[in-house]
């Protein structure tokens, strides 16, 4: 997800000489590649299956390497061969994606100086969050739907996001009950657990290969969705895929807050034109004017971005 924030910060792919294989897959099926087509030419073969070949990174002659703080051994490997390396945390703010991207933007400013397109991003995000909070608070005894976010699919099981993850932030702030709160982080869940929870709303991350129709048409092996409220009432939604997958922190995180709130409380946020918000945001911060077709594809993505080559 850092790549999308980097491109937002620098106004493009300037200085970017290597990206992860997962980032390239997401870019190929998102609008990152449409905005900056040459990102698909940036090398990613130094990483296979999530494992980094440090010697191959060295051949790229980077001035600095960014890596995930959850992989300290990777940072040590870079330093052993003399490469300056900076870690970026994805969980520093206990699942708050707004705090996370603000942190990342601060790091990038310290490294590169003033950014090209970031003035106002954090403010927009905080104003959006406050609007959602105020509207939910003003609604008084608003019914909070039971909801679950499926983050992926592993070991023939859907993976649910619980506490201490972005799901906690989105569902709490946007007015829902996280039925998977008993899970610390992410964990595979079976059919019996889903029946026990009986979520009224299901949100699907872009790391998960399924789309709402797979739930409605019972196409997920090992699961029968006919008795689940969210499926019976056609309240299964796929997270949008804009400049990156919207569930984790990205340049589009401020928009994601609005989108989640609207899926959970469509009547309360019926006046929000998410397509207009998206268009205005992209024009202001990415200097890119999406077409109606672009917006439709962003808001209703397919399954391709979950496929890692």
Identify the function of each model-found stretch.
Residues 52-53, 73-74, 189-193:
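Short acidic active-site motifs
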Residues 9-11, 58-59, 79-80, 139-143, ...:
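Extracellular/periplasmic catalytic domains that process cell-envelope and extracellular macromolecules
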Residues 18, 67, 87-88, 181, ...:
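Short beta-strand and adjacent tight-turn residues that come in two discontinuous sequence segments
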Residues 1-3, 22-25, 64-65, 70-74, ...:
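Solvent-exposed loop/turn segments at secondary-structure junctions
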Residues 181, 186-241:
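A contiguous binding-surface segment within folded domains or other stable secondary-structure elements
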Residues 46, 159-186:
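Alpha-helical, coiled-coil/dimerization segments enriched in small aliphatic residues
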Residues 1-60, 64, 69-70:
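A short, structured surface patch at a secondary-structure boundary
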Residues 74-156, 177-181, 231-301, 305-308:
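Extracytoplasmic substrate-binding proteins
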């Amino acid at each position: 997800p850092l790549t999308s924030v980097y491109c937002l910060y620098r106004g493009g792919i300037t200085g970017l000489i290597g990206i992860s294989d997962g980032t390239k897959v997401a870019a190929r099926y998102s609008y990152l590649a449409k905005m900056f087509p040459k990102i698909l030419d940036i090398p990613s073969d130094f990483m296979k299956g999530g494992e980094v070949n440090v010697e191959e990174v060295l051949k790229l002659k980077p001035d600095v390497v960014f890596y995930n703080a959850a992989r300290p051994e990777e940072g040590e490997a870079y330093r052993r061969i003399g490469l300056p390396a900076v870690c970026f945390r994805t969980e520093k703010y206990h699942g708050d994606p707004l705090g996370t991207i603000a942190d990342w933007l601060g790091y990038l400013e310290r490294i590169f100086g003033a950014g090209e397109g970031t003035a106002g991003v954090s403010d927009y995000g905080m104003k959006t969050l406050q609007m959602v909070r105020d509207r939910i608070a003003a609604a008084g005894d608003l019914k909070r739907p039971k909801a679950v976010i499926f983050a992926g699919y592993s070991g023939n099981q859907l993976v649910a996001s619980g506490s201490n993850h972005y799901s906690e932030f989105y569902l709490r702030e946007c007015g829902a009950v996280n039925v998977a709160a008993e899970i610390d982080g992410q964990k595979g869940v079976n059919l019996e657990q889903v029946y026990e929870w009986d979520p009224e709303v299901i949100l699907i991350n872009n790391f998960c290969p399924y789309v709402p129709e797979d739930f409605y048409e019972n196409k997920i092996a090992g699961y029968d969705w006919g008795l689940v409220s969210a499926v019976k009432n056609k309240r299964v939604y796929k997270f949008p895929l804009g400049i990156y997958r919207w569930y984790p922190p990205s340049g589009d995180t401020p928009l994601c807050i609005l989108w989640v709130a609207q899926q959970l409380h469509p009547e309360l946020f019926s006046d929000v034109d998410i397509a207009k918000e998206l268009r205005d945001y992209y024009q202001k911060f990415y200097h890119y004017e999406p077409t109606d077709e672009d917006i439709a594809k962003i808001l209703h993505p397919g399954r391709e971005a979950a496929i890692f080559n």
